[in-house]
Amino acid sequence: MHPHIGVDESGKGDFFGPLVVAACYVGPEHLAELEGVKDSKKLTDPIALKLATNIKRVCPHAVISIGPAKYNELYNSFRNLNKLLAWGHARAIENVLGQQPADLVISDQFANPAELKRRLFEKGKTVELQSMVRAEADIAVAAASILARAEFLTRLKRLGEEFGTTLPKGASDLVIKAGVAFVRKEGQEKLGQVAKLHFKTFLNVMELAKL
C-alpha cells in the first residue's frame, strides 16, 4: 500500500454534541496493528472506543473537536456546512502533516473538493487530494472515522453529564423529546451550548417547548 492520510468526521448529522474531524496517517508498517479497523458506522460504540485507543497509540493522527457553541459561531460565519467541514478537515490534515510527511490524502466524497484545497495551508497545498465514494473502505479513512466517532461519543457523554442529563445521538423523535426537556429545564439560551442550532430539529424543539 502507498502510505497516506485518511480524513473523516462524526457528529455532522447529530443535533446534540460537537462536530469532530479526525485525520490519520497509515503506512505499511501500521497494518499489522490495525486489525479490526473498518468503517466506524459498522462498529458498536464500545468497540469504536477501544479501537480508537489502539489507533492513537500506533498512528500519527489529529482530532479536531468543534463544540456546539463554537460550531454555532462558525456556522453563522460560514453560513454553509460544507465550508465548515472543509475548514475542520484542513486543520486536521495540517496537524498530521506536521507530525508525518505524506503526499496523498483520501477523504469521503466532498461536495466541493476545491473548497478543501483552498482551506489548506502551506504543507497541505503540496499533497494530492482524493475524494472517494464510500471512502471508509480505505484503511486510513476507516481509522480516522473511528477516531472521530470515539471523540464524539466521549464529548457527547461529557456534555450531558455537565447538565445532569443524557443527550441522545442523531436527530430522531427521541432527540426532539430530549431537546424539549432540556429547554424546559435549562432555558433556550443554553441550548446552543449542547446543540447545533441550524438543524430543523431546533425549530421542532422550540415549537414543542412552548406547549
Predicted regions and their residues:
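RNase H-like, Mg2+-dependent phosphodiesterase core
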Residues: 1-211
